[in-house]
UniProtKB/Swiss-Prot annotation:
Belongs to the SUI1 family. GO terms for cellular component: eukaryotic 43S preinitiation complex. Keywords: Protein biosynthesis, Translation regulation. Probably involved in translation. It comes from Anopheles gambiae. Signal peptide: none annotated. The keyword NAD does not apply. This is Eukaryotic translation initiation factor eIF1. Pfam families: SUI1. PROSITE patterns: SUI1. It comes from the Eukaryota. GO terms for molecular function: ribosomal small subunit binding; RNA binding; translation initiation factor activity. GO terms for biological process: regulation of translation.
Length: 110
């Protein structure tokens, strides 16, 4: 009898599956990553390079009362990281601020 629940979960795995999930496809991918215990990270990938991501993170931190940063991912470029489950908040905020249309947002996670 083997234990099947010890597999690792890669939140970026579905972005690697096919060529249609390219950074240039116009989609903004919003993912959630499990850290330790109840702690989670929300990552946002695919925002246009013309936006200053540090200013976006600063506004999100103030709006959602959470911590955040911009990390440089080797495959996906600059990715926003926010602490906590901010998937719904970031979707509403991106559409309200005009940074992305609702049909451009693709939410991944549990």
């Amino acid at each position: 009898m083997s234990i099947q629940n010890l597999n690792t979960f890669d939140p970026f795995a579905d972005a690697i599956k096919g060529a249609d999930y390219d950074v240039q496809d116009g989609l903004v991918h919003i993912r959630i990553q499990q850290r330790n215990g109840r702690k989670t990270l929300t990552t946002v990938q695919g925002l246009s390079a013309e936006y200053d991501l540090k200013k976006i993170v600063r506004a999100c931190k103030k709006e959602f009362a959470c911590n955040g940063t911009v990390i440089e991912h080797p495959e996906y470029g600059e990715v926003l990281q926010l602490q906590g489950d901010q998937r719904e908040n970031i979707c509403q905020w991106l559409t309200k601020s005009g940074l992305a249309k609702p049909e451009q947002l693709k939410v991944h996670g549990f």
